[in-house]
Amino acid sequence: MDITDEKKIPAVKKFLSTNRWYKVNFMALIVLTVIYKLTEYLLNINGLAFRSAVVYSVGAVIYILIIAVLFQSARLLYRFAANKGLEQAKRVISGIGSAVISLVFAAVLVISVIYGPLFLAFSYKPEHVVEKEGKKMVAYVNSFLDVFVDYYDYVNPFVRGSQVRIDEWLGSGGYDPFEKDRMPGVKSATYYNEEGNVIKAFG
């Protein structure tokens, strides 16, 4: 190792030590994603699923961490490219990497701003904990054109059953029936057992 290399190593170590928030955010993103997906898988094989509050909360945190990591990655690589203590080839590669990640970062932001509200408007289903035929259940409303309500077994504030137990059609309207003073009449309904087999239907 020559003197030049010996000078480079402390400079690189010092440079990396100033980016601890990048490391924290990156590790948080990896750990949170792995824990969430693993827990989701374990729930799924046991006939359970996360409720909306958990899904949206974790999704929002992961999105924020992705944005932070992309921004910090681009900044980190840019600083590598500007570091004259590094070899020219590494600086060039870092500069290219910074440019690519910056474009990805910008694309994610633009797509989020333009299509994010539209995606949320179509994907969001109001959730209600209700008493249905003497049983506590979690109801989800899909009311884009016609009004559909899916009922799942209630487990706790964070988890529900993954199998639809009752699905109802309340006709056209585009409204949330649980926000009405009086629940509208059900046009048709299908009941399922825990295995997803139809046990009765009407309408």
Predicted regions and their residues:
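Membrane-interface helix-boundary motifs at transmembrane edges
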Residues: 14-17, 79-93
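Alpha-helical transmembrane signal-anchor/signal-peptide segments
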Residues: 114-137
